[in-house]
Design a protein with these regions (language model features):
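A short, polar/charged loop-to-alpha-helix boundary motif
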Residues: 50-61
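Short beta->alpha transition motifs characteristic of CBS
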Residues: 41-48
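Short beta-strand scaffold segments in enzyme catalytic cores
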Residues: 30-38
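Immediate flanking context of iron-sulfur cluster ligation sites
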Residues: 72-84
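Residues that line or immediately flank small-molecule/substrate-binding pockets and catalytic motifs
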Residues: 48, 82, 106
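Short, charged low-complexity linear segments at domain edges
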Residues: 59-73
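Zinc-dependent deaminase
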Residues: 1-27, 73, 89-153
Length: 153
């Protein structure tokens, strides 16, 4: 796929993740999209408040759905698009599930595990590490989070 078309696809998938994030109600607005072979196979939003699930992060929700679609917990060849840098819990689940690529929007200096607060994607781990690309549509993703937290004050 030509680079310009790949870049266009990256922004389209991130826009879809952002639209999902906007649909969350009382949860922190984070949306995730999983793509396999050019097709969206799963989506997720934060569901911690709605389902009283401490592990109900958008990435985990989407990965669970993707595993069901693929009938395999190994998500090799999948790309994960998410509006906020994954936390340590999600990053480790991403590594364990063998996701091939992570694309995220806003950096999370408080708990981001793709390099902001921690970096779990380091060489020497016993699993293949995904390619990580951050800061895609960062301003839009950041603004959505700011609006959410301003409304909670």
């Amino acid at each position: 796929m030509p680079e310009s078309q790949q870049n266009r696809q990256t922004y389209l998938y991130m826009e879809q993740a952002l639209q999902l994030a906007r649909q969350t109600e009382e949860d922190v607005p984070v949306g995730a999209v999983i793509v396999h072979n050019g097709l969206v196979i799963a989506t997720g939003v934060n569901e911690r408040e709605r389902n009283l699930d401490p592990a109900g992060h958008a990435e985990i929700v989407a990965m669970r759905k993707a595993a069901q679609v693929l009938k395999n917990w190994r998500l090799t060849g999948c790309q994960l698009y998410v509006t906020l840098e994954p936390c340590a819990m999600c990053a480790e689940a991403i590594i364990q599930s063998r996701v091939s690529t992570i694309v995220f929007g806003a950096y999370d200096p408080r708990s981001g595990a793709c390099g902001s607060a921690y970096n779990l994607f380091i060489a020497g781990r016993p699993y293949p590490m995904p390619e990580v690309l951050g800061g895609i549509m960062e301003a839009e993703c950041k603004e959505l989070l700011k609006e959410f937290f301003r409304s909670r004050d």
